[in-house]
Curated annotation (Swiss-Prot):
Cofactor note text: Binds 1 zinc ion per subunit.
A Gene Ontology biological process term: glutamyl-tRNA aminoacylation
A single MF term (Gene Ontology): zinc ion binding
The encoding gene: gltX
Positions with a binding annotation for Zn(2+): C117, C119, C144, H146
Subunit record text: Monomer.
Name used for this protein in its record: Glutamate--tRNA ligase
Subcellular compartments: Cytoplasm
UniProt entry keywords in alphabetical sequence: Aminoacyl-tRNA synthetase, ATP-binding, Cytoplasm, Ligase, Metal-binding, Nucleotide-binding, Protein biosynthesis, Zinc
Function: Catalyzes the attachment of glutamate to tRNA(Glu) in a two-step reaction: glutamate is first activated by ATP to form Glu-AMP and then transferred to the acceptor end of tRNA(Glu).
Length: 509
């Protein structure tokens, strides 16, 4: 293997990008990759831009896009071009660039580097099932790759739905150059004939990111290592178009303490959770900068400017960096200790004075207080991170501990999938689940008061869940399940099967 590439592709101005998909909450992994893209660009006198990959029209939302942009800005990242600030390569939302992708997909067909595939989803499912039964890797077998031009034109004329797939070699090895790994060899037999344009005319990630990176003059692509196996497809597309390929750098993925891929089922993963919990943006950015990377002087506490000034991408370690909340809290404490009392006062006021949240809290506690000082007792749980609870806190005359764990876990999974976080949707979900489990609503809700507020004596819990938001609610529910001892693998598997069979409680409303 070659030595890792240190090239910055100096013949081109350095331009990097982050391209989040607005399909959920702003993930710390997005901020992590964005940080290194920004730092690398600035360290080489270049530009960092942002674009939105919203080709998944069923899951992409304007609300999610706004949350992502707000969260990245809150943590201290900024971009010179993007959907909110404009720029010379607009538009920066892929959903607004469909004509561009269609033109390039047609260009690949004209050059015979791509073909139309008319296979139905049922045919593809059968094909994959047969391959798996034979111990083969499931991949498209090329059955439409050699259709005669006349046949293809006839099917298109008849209006038969089709996708556009890229052609790939059937033998040999693709050599991909990576800044951290040097030459990576991937057999072409492991590379699928990727769909480039879907039946609805929208591109897949693979076509859109290549076309956009070229048209937006991206010189370096720093992205998660989960994309390494897709690099041959992207490299091939650059060759097909006759374009210069950006330098690739596949960053190690963030891991849970047990070394598994960072996921919301084991750790809070949303930037907004850490903001609401009281982590300073400087501390979170500092911590993400330490993920798989060490400063030349081994400093643990450093600013973004200090990171940029001394950045050496070769200091990134390929071992999966552990995202440890306890270490983040320690680092946050270091930042807090360094503040003057006046600065700390202002930080606390900024953190606590989310006006929309405060108005909602005031409305919730207003019927319950006689003095302004009563607000402290009634509203404290809205601002804390995790309530001080133990297994005994959940003791209930009508429910066993096992029942409580299972209903909390089922509720957690249901709430994770809510399309919009609102009191109405929370109510419909929990009411439907209680009825499905044949548990009286009063009994069913008691453990939720404990999990969310730490007490059964609090403001209405579903209203409280709406106010503290999805991230904090889900984190407190996970904490409650853990406090109660959690679920073993067998019980978890059984419960997952039960969860898969639950009806859509929102549709029932």
């Amino acid at each position: 293997m070659m030595q890792p590439s240190t090239s910055t592709n100096s013949n081109r101005p350095v331009r990097t990008r982050i391209a989040p998909s607005p399909t959920g909450f702003p993930h710390v992994g997005t901020a992590y990759i964005a940080l290194f893209n920004l730092a690398f660009a600035k360290a080489h006198g270049g530009e960092f831009i942002l674009r939105i990959e919203d080709t998944d029209q069923t899951r992409s939302t304007e609300q999610s896009e706004k949350m992502i942009l707000d969260a990245l800005r809150w943590v201290g990242l900024d971009w010179s071009e993007g959907p909110d600030v404009g720029g010379p390569h607009a538009p920066y939302r892929q959903s607004e660039r469909s004509a561009i992708y269609k033109k390039h997909a047609e260009q690949l067909i004209d050059s015979d580097h791509a073909f139309r595939c008319f296979c139905t989803s049922e045919e593809l499912d059968t094909m994959r099932a047969e391959q798996m039964a034979n111990g083969e890797t499931p991949r498209y077998d090329g059955r439409c790759a050699h259709l005669a031009t006349e046949k293809t034109e006839q099917l298109v004329k008849e209006g038969k739905p089709n996708v556009i797939r890229m052609r790939v070699p059937t033998e040999g090895v693709c050599q991909v150059q990576d800044m951290l790994r040097g030459t990576v060899e991937i057999p072409w037999t492991q590379v699928d004939m990727q769909v480039l344009l879907k039946t609805d005319g929208m591109p897949t990630y693979h076509l859109a990111n290549v076309v956009d990176d070229h048209l937006m003059d991206i010189s370096h692509v720093l992205r998660g290592e989960e994309w390494l196996n897709s690099a041959p497809k992207h490299q091939l597309l650059y060759e097909y178009f006759g374009w210069e390929m950006p330098v690739l750098c596949h960053m190690p993925l963030l891991r849970n303490p047990d070394k598994s891929k960072l996921s919301k089922r084991k750790n809070p993963t949303s930037i907004t959770y850490y903001r609401d919990a009281g982590v300073l943006p400087e501390a979170l950015l500092n911590y993400l900068g330490r993920m798989g990377y060490s400063m030349p002087d081994e400093a643990e506490k450093f600013t973004l400017d200090e990171m940029i000034a001394s950045l050496d991408i070769q200091r990134v370690s390929l071992g999966g960096p552990i995202f440890d909340i306890e270490k983040l809290n320690w680092l946050n404490a270091e930042w807090l200790r360094a503040l003057t009392p006046e600065e700390l006062k202002n930080k606390i006021l900024d953190w606590a004075s989310n006006s929309d949240k405060l108005t909602a809290i005031a409305a919730a506690i207003q019927p319950r207080i006689e003095l302004l000082s009563d607000a402290v007792n009634w509203s404290g749980f809205y601002f804390q991170n995790l309530p001080d609870i133990n297994a005994e806190s959940f003791t209930h005359k009508s429910l066993t501990a096992e029942q409580i764990i299972e209903m909390l876990q089922l509720a957690l999974w249901q709430l994770e999938t809510l399309p919009t976080w609102s009191e109405e949707n929370i109510y419909a979900t929990l009411k439907g689940l209680a009825a499905h489990l044949d548990i009286k609503m009063r009994d069913f809700m008691a453990p939720f008061f404990i999990a969310i507020a730490g007490s059964t004596s609090s403001t209405p819990v579903m209203n409280s869940m709406a106010i503290i938001g999805a991230d904090m609610t889900l984190t407190r529910l996970r904490h409650a399940v853990d406090v109660l001892g959690g679920l073993g693998k067998k019980k978890l598997k059984k419960l997952e099967k039960q969860a898969a069979e639950l009806p859509d409680f929102l549709a029932a409303e």
